[in-house]
Regions:
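Glycine-rich phosphate/diphosphate-binding loop of Rossmann-like nucleotide-binding domains
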Residues: 6-46
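Predominant activation on well-ordered alpha-helical scaffold segments within soluble catalytic domains
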Residues: 16-24, 60, 64, 200-208
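A structural-propensity feature for long, helix-poor, extended segments
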Residues: 37-66
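Gly/Ser/Thr-rich loops at beta-strand to alpha-helix junctions
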Residues: 2-12, 53-54, 80-84
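Active-site-proximal beta-alpha loop/turn segments in soluble metabolic enzymes
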Residues: 1-9, 44-49, 185, 189
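Structural motif
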Residues: 74-76
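A structural signal for small-residue-enriched, beta-sheet-centric alpha/beta enzyme cores
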Residues: 47-48, 78-225
Length: 225
């Protein structure tokens, strides 16, 4: 089963729904396909449950109900992420087998989608598409501090002070200072709509090829879209 925890009304968060629209769904065709095609594909289901702000239901509750009813052997969860470094935005596709916490990147902690809660293995796929204001300021401060350290004589008290600044402590301090002025501000690149489309194609193609043993990239490009 393939599911997502994204808000399709927000461009940088619409990665999941765009991937779902390109997944080769075959569960409803099981037993009705010709033998040669039946051997080439596996039963796959896909769902885009939305977010709690749209449905009023926890994404995890919807997914748990589906898992309990369908008993899939594997869940692939796709989500847009918040980057902790500005140079990571739209620059990496992250995968893990430890599940995903929908909304955690923007401060909305929801029910975990992991094996402990769902009872089946969960592969999480995510792409950082936004960054918060504190991270942007933190990255700028890092560049300034690196230049100051480079120009400061080693061994001096000022040098040691600069060198001893902890990354997480600095980030938390910046977030607390900016909080009253910017609130929960997140930004995304202006070309995010085109980037999300390309990323959705890459992820969907990869999932289709991985799940269906008889499907190649050439087949997808020829018949899918």
């Amino acid at each position: 089963a393939v599911c997502i925890g994204c808000n399709w009304n927000i461009t940088p968060d619409a990665l999941g729904p765009k991937v779902i629209s390109k997944i080769l769904v075959t569960r409803h065709l099981s037993g009705t396909l010709p033998v040669e095609i039946e051997k080439a594909v596996r039963p796959v289901a896909a769902v885009s449950p939305g977010v709690m702000g749209i449905t009023g239901i926890e994404t995890g509750e919807i997914v748990k109900g589906i898992v309990d009813k369908l008993h899939p052997s594997l869940l692939i969860a796709i989500d847009a992420l918040a980057a902790r470094r500005s140079n990571r935005i739209n620059a990496a596709i992250q995968m893990s087998d430890t599940g995903v916490a929908p909304g955690a990147g923007v401060g909305n902690r929801r029910m975990l989608l992991d094996e402990a809660h769902l009872g089946i293995p969960v592969i999480a796929i995510g792409v950082p598409t936004v960054v918060d204001a504190a991270t942007l300021v933190n990255d700028t401060m890092d560049c300034i501090l690196e230049e100051m350290i480079r120009q400061t004589e080693k061994g001096t008290a000022f040098y040691e002070t600069l060198a001893d600044l902890e990354q997480e402590e600095k980030y938390q301090m910046i977030a607390e200072i900016l909080g009253p002025y910017t609130g929960n501000l997140f930004v995304t690149p202006k070309e995010v709509d085109a980037v999300v489309d390309r990323l959705a194609n890459i992820i969907a193609n990869s999932i289709n090829i991985a799940l269906h043993p008889g499907i190649t990239l050439e087949d997808i490009n020829k018949y899918a879209w």
